Amino acid sequence: MRQERITETVSERSPLKKTKAYRQEMKNGAGLGKDCAVLCAGLKTSGADQDIVVSKWIGLEGTARLAGENYERLRERFPARMIEEAAAFDRYLSVIPEAATAMKSGVCGIQAVSRGGIFAGLWEMAEEAGVGLEADLRKIPVRQETIEICEFFGENPYELLSGGCLIMTASDGNALVTALLREGIPAVVIGRTTRGNDRVLYNEGRKQFLNKPRW
C-alpha cells in the first residue's frame, strides 16, 4: 500500500483522542506561534562561533501524526503502549516555555523547527544568519518511538515534521542547557556556528553537507 505523506492535519477519525493544546498548536502552525514571536521580539541574530542548542526532541509533531492516524497499521508490529505514547507527543508541541527561559539565559538566536525537520531548520537558521555550521548527528536528540515509527513508514526522522523543537544559538551553550534543564526542559548542545557558508554534519567521522530544503 502506498504511504501517504504527512501534509494534512491530524484526522478526526483517529482512534486516539487529541488534546486541546495539540489542536491549538495545529491551528497556530506549530511554529513559534504569535505569543512566542512577541516574546522573542528584539532578539539578536545568530552569529559565527556560537553554540547550537536543540530543545526537547526532533520529529515530535510528525511522530504524533503518524501514530495517531495509523494506529491499526502500527499495531501489527508495535505494542499499544508505545503507539499511544508516540501519539501523545502532542503534549510537547508548545515551545513557549523554552523560549521564555532562553530569553533570560543568554540566547542569541531562536529558530523553530517544523517542516523539513531538523535538517531544514539548521539550514534555515544558518542561511538567515549568514553563517556556516558544524554539528554532530549523534548528538541530535530523537526519541526511540520516532526512530521505530519512521523505520516502519520509510521516513527520515531528521526530515520529519518537528513542531515542538527549537534550535537556539548562544555564546555559552552549556549555560543555556543548564538553565533549560533546571526548568525541566530537555536540551543539548549539538554543534557550533562557523564563519563561511559550509553547513556540515558529522556522523562517526563521516562528513556530509546540508542541502537547501526542497520546497
Which residue ranges define each predicted feature?
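Solvent-exposed alpha-helices and their adjacent loops that cap or buttress functional pockets
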Residues: 20-25, 43-47, 101-104, 127, ...
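Glycine-rich anion-binding loops of enzyme active sites
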Residues: 1-66, 192
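Active-site-proximal betaalpha loop/short-helix elements
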Residues: 86-161
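Beta-strand->loop->alpha-helix junctions that form or flank phosphate-binding loops
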Residues: 113-114, 132-141, 159-161, 177-204
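Acidic, Ser/Thr/Pro-rich beta/coil linker or hinge segments at domain junctions
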Residues: 2-21, 183-215
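Short, compositionally biased
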Residues: 64-81
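Helix N-cap motif at beta-to-alpha junctions
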Residues: 169-175
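A short beta-alpha structural unit
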Residues: 163-169
